A protein has these predicted regions:
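Membrane-helix interface "capping/anchor" motifs
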Residues: 50-58, 96-106
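Generic transmembrane alpha-helix signature in multi-pass membrane proteins
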Residues: 74, 108-115
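Internal alpha-helical transmembrane segments of multi-pass membrane proteins
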Residues: 78-103
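Alpha-helical transmembrane segments and their membrane-interface boundaries
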Residues: 1-68, 72, 77-86, 117-152
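Mid-sequence acidic-hydrophobic segments that form the walls
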Residues: 93-98, 114, 139, 143
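Transmembrane helix boundary and interhelical junction motifs in multipass membrane proteins
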Residues: 34-37, 103-109
C-alpha cells in the first residue's frame, strides 16, 4: 500500500513539475526548459526524496557537470559519435562520483548533447534554469505539502 501512495504522489508531483517546464518551453519566449533526463530526475526526486542522489547539489551539479562533459567532446574532439558518446558518458559518471555530485539521470546528458549537437546556450536553458525550477518545486512540494525533510 505504501508503494501505491508513494507512486501516486510521485506521479502527481512529476506531472506538476514537468507541466511547468513544458508551459515555460511552449507558451513563453524564454527558451527551452525541458530535457529528457529531467523525466528520470522526477522519479527519484518525488519517489525517493531521501536519496543522496536527489539532493540539490547532486541534481544541479550532476546535470551541469555531465552536460559540460558532453559539450567538451562535442566542441573539442571531432571524433566519430560512436567514440565521443561513450567517452563523454564515462567522463561524466567518473567526475560525478569523484566530486560527490552523482545524479544518475544526468548520466544521459552527454548523449542528449552530442546527438542533438546543442549550442553553448543549452547550459542556461534548459540545464541551469530547468534544474533551478525542478529544485524549487522539489523543495516546495516535499516540504510544504508532504512535510518531508527535503533537502536532507
Amino acid at each position: 500500500k505504501e508503494n501505491i501512495i508513494r507512486g501516486l504522489i510521485a506521479g502527481l508531483f512529476s506531472t506538476i513539475t514537468i507541466a511547468a517546464l513544458t508551459l515555460l518551453t511552449y507558451k513563453t519566449q524564454y527558451g527551452i526548459f525541458l530535457m529528457a533526463s529531467f523525466g528520470s530526475s522526477m522519479a527519484l526526486l518525488y519517489g525517493y526524496p531521501e536519496s543522496p542522489f536527489v539532493q540539490p547539489k547532486n541534481i544541479f551539479f550532476g546535470h551541469l557537470l555531465s552536460t559540460i562533459c558532453g559539450m567538451i567532446f562535442l566542441f573539442f574532439f571531432p571524433l566519430p559519435i560512436y567514440i565521443t558518446i561513450p567517452l563523454a558518458v564515462g567522463l561524466a559518471v567518473s567526475l560525478m562520483i569523484m566530486l560527490d555530485v552523482s545524479h544518475p539521470p544526468a548520466g544521459g546528458n552527454p548523449i542528449i548533447v552530442i546527438m542533438g549537437s546543442v549550442s553553448l546556450d543549452y547550459l542556461i536553458n534548459p540545464v541551469i534554469s530547468g534544474t533551478i525550477i525542478i529544485l524549487a518545486f522539489g523543495i516546495i512540494l516535499n516540504r510544504l505539502i508532504l512535510k518531508k525533510k527535503y533537502p536532507i
